Amino acid sequence: MSQTQPPAPVGPGDPDVYLKGVPSAGMHPRGVHAPRGHPRMISGPPQRGDNDQAAGQCGDSGLLRVGADTTISKPSEAVRPPTIPRTPRVPREPRVPRPPREPREPRVPRASRDPRVPRDPRDPRQPRSPREPRSPREPRPPREPRTPRTTREPRTARGAV
């Protein structure tokens, strides 16, 4: 019986951590590329800009630096304005010819109006004459007392029989 080696402790960058294959650059935990004793030993996928001096400071991940001065060309379909499909016009019935209208009289410019002449000031409105008291209404005939409805069984809760 052959002796088996005891399993080695699993550490960052060990191929045993991953399911199969050699760990690619994207599979390393985040602290792997940091120099030994680097304060940033964080596990997780590598972030562009973690150890990239060109990425700038203050959380600039460096992703926007790819081609800041180059313009991304759009496909030609995106530039063309969309064409609205036109429905073919349905020919209308031919118009019935009308007899020609009699010519209108040419419009004559109106004579300029004089400024408005103020009306004669009226006396302030006279107070109304007091109303004559109305004649008292004829008294209505007394109402008949309302008759109670036909007697029914007292209502019970729904479904109760």
From Swiss-Prot:
Biased composition (Basic and acidic residues): 90-161
Biased composition regions of type Basic residues, renumbered to the chain: 30-39
GO BP field: symbiont-mediated suppression of host autophagy; symbiont-mediated suppression of host cytoplasmic pattern recognition receptor signaling pathway via inhibition of MDA-5 activity; symbiont-mediated suppression of host cytoplasmic pattern recognition receptor signaling pathway via inhibition of RIG-I activity; symbiont-mediated suppression of host PKR/eIFalpha signaling; symbiont-mediated suppression of host type I interferon-mediated signaling pathway
Intervals holding Sequence repeats: 85-90, 91-96, 97-102, 103-108, 109-114, 115-120, 121-126, 127-132, 133-138, 139-144, 145-150, 151-156
Subunit structure: Associates with RNA derived from the 60S ribosomal subunits. Seems to form large heterogeneous polymers of up to 200 identical subunits in the cytoplasm. Interacts with host EIF2AK2. Interacts with host NCL. Interacts with host RIGI; this interaction prevents RIGI binding to host MAVS. Interacts with host IFIH1; this interaction prevents host IFH1 binding to MAVS.
Family per record: Belongs to the simplex virus US11 protein family.
UniProt name for this protein: RNA-binding protein
